[in-house]
Regions:
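Phosphate-binding core of ATP-grasp and ATP-grasp-like enzymes
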Residues: 111, 116-128, 159-172, 194-200
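Short histidine-centered catalytic/ligand-binding loop motif
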Residues: 38-48, 132-154
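A long amphipathic alpha-helix within ATP-dependent nucleotide-binding catalytic cores
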Residues: 142-174
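A short glycine-rich, hydrophobically flanked beta-strand micro-motif that places a catalytic Asp/Glu
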Residues: 71-76, 166-181
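Basic/polar N-terminal segments that are highly enriched at the extreme N-terminus
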Residues: 1-4, 238-240
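Active-site loop/lid in soluble adenylation, ligation, and acyl-transfer enzymes
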Residues: 2-122, 233
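C-terminal helix-cap and adjacent tail motif
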Residues: 111, 194-240
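Conserved metal-phosphate-binding beta-hairpin within the catalytic cores
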Residues: 93, 173-192
Length: 240
């Protein structure tokens, strides 16, 4: 499947039309950003590892009952996906406190939460992706009650499935964000990506950070850490 026209360009991914009106090509670039785009850098090889990492995770979730937009990997940096009508919402689950919630609530980094904590955020870089709740979503027409409940249900299921996958590879899934959209058949599918760019993964013994916090905090070895996570999961990352 060939790319025809770029229709969306984000901070680290682009979407292209194809000969099929229901399918898009998702391209993963080496571009890396943090703090709503205020810190930027190109990290050689990150796009390839993220594309193939995402495919591995999406395939694993599909096998465990989570419908996703992923169809197939086309090459090292491109994947074919279903075209969706996206919700302008990020769904976040936290198993431990880290990042923005520590700043917001003054909690210690790494605090183990009694239960997984679910949060909604509005997807808007200019506003800093503000925290929102169900009432905001319904009042502004971003999703209805049934869609909200389905997104919550699927996000919790993603957490259950992936926590087990990662802990079996000596990794702690600290938190993650996911996005959803509606396909042409009307089903809500997991969309966008699941990579170390959008989750926190710590070594279960040393608590070493293996995710994009290495970029945010200037720890270095970002792509190398992504490869280490992929290796632990048994992936064979190919670079064209």
């Amino acid at each position: 499947m060939e790319k025809i026209k770029e229709i969306t360009k984000g901070k680290a991914k682009s979407l292209f039309t194809t000969s099929s009106e229901d399918q898009l090509v998702m391209h993963f670039s080496d571009d890396t950003s943090a703090f709503d785009g205020k810190k930027k850098e190109a990290l050689l090889g990150k796009g390839a590892v993220n594309n193939q990492f995402n495919a591995f995770i999406m395939d694993h979730l599909e096998k465990n009952g989570v419908e996703t937009h992923h169809i197939e990997v086309l090459n090292s940096n491109d994947s074919l996906v279903c075209k969706l009508d996206m919700f302008p919402i990020e769904c976040v689950i936290r198993n431990r406190a880290s990042g923005s919630i520590c700043r917001r609530l003054g909690t210690e980094d790494g605090l183990v939460l009694e239960n997984p904590l679910f949060e909604f955020f509005l997807k808007d870089d200019d506003l800093g992706d503000p925290l929102i709740n169900d009432e905001h979503i319904i009042s502004f027409g971003w999703a209805n009650k049934e869609q909200i409940e389905k997104m919550k249900e699927l996000t919790y299921k993603v957490n259950t499935v992936l926590k087990e996958l990662f802990i079996n590879s000596n990794l702690i899934l600290v938190d993650f964000k996911v996005e959803f959209g509606v396909c042409s058949q009307g089903n809500i599918l997991l969309a966008d990506e699941f990579t170390p760019d959008g989750c926190r993964l710590w070594d279960s013994e040393t608590l070493k950070k293996m995710d994009k916090d290495r970029f945010r905090q200037g720890l270095g070895d970002v792509v190398e850490s992504y490869h280490q996570v992929a290796d632990r999961l048994g992936m064979n990352i190919i670079v064209d």
